[in-house]
Amino acid sequence: MLREKVDLPMPIGYNLVPDSLNKEKAAISAGLYYSGYEVSTNRPQKLNNFDVVVMWNRWNENEKLADKLESQGGNVIIAENGYLGTDYIALARSEHNGGGWIPYADLDRLEALQINFKPYRTDGEHILVCPSRGFGSKKMRQPINWTHEIVQELRNYTTRPIYVREHPGNWKQNNNHLSLAEDLDHAWACVIWNSGAGIHSLMQGIPVICCADYWILKDIASDIQFIENPAMLDRYHAFNKLAWSQWSIDEIVSGEPFIRFSLC
């Protein structure tokens, strides 16, 4: 019986992280290579079955390309700044921050990432509103007038003082601002669209009101009408899932996250 040898093409990993993020781009290129991809920095117009694209955030031209590739069945991974500090990069399929898929394994990753919680706070004075920066994909970005509208809506449910903390990325230079920890001091609750400030609020034991349809910790947040009686749910499982979206540079270089994405 004659057998014909078939040479399958090597899958391509397209690294579209901008050159300005040289450390992150180099790590992702290495990780794609060590997980079995031929690495390219070109912008593809079509993907083969096992190809993958890694892009930094999903908005503007990246969103247009991601929409096109996914409509063809392509595999798109979104990278962005980590949610637990500068030592990590966040990775998720299709969308970031709870809007996409992460390679969650039912294993404890919290200890490795040294995530610790303070007990839930049972007192507090003010409501802290933390808007997002205002850009992103159609699915995830905060509505333009959200901050003004949410402050007005909060007045229907509480008489507490309401403070608005603008996103640090929108701060003007030479202005003095309190740290997030200082703004959270004596806070009763933190209100977000889907800002990362909510992650740190929950770690500090301060309940979160989330107004977006998608957020990485949506399962343990409350709706606005519960501002005076916010949920104080167990945080372990939600944060353990979040931890599987956070990868160190060394882990990314090893290729582990891309292998996990390729298996599902």
Question: Where do the PLM segments sit?
Answer:
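Extended catalytic core of nucleotide-activated donor transferases of GT-like folds
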Residues: 25-27, 33-89
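Conserved catalytic-core segment of nucleotide-activated headgroup transferases in glycan assembly
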Residues: 122-171
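Donor nucleotide-activated moiety binding/catalytic core segment of transferases
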Residues: 40-47, 61, 65, 155, ...
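N-terminal pre-catalytic "stem/leader" segment of glycosyltransferase-like enzymes
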Residues: 1-52, 135-136, 259-264
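Leloir-type glycosyltransferase catalytic cores
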Residues: 88-125, 140-141, 218-264
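Short acidic, S/G/P-rich loop/turn micro-motifs used as interaction or catalytic elements
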Residues: 16-21, 59-62, 134-138, 169-170, ...
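Structural motif
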Residues: 51-52, 126, 188-189
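Short loop/turn segments at strand-loop or loop-helix junctions that form parts
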Residues: 5-14, 79-83, 125-136, 165-168, ...
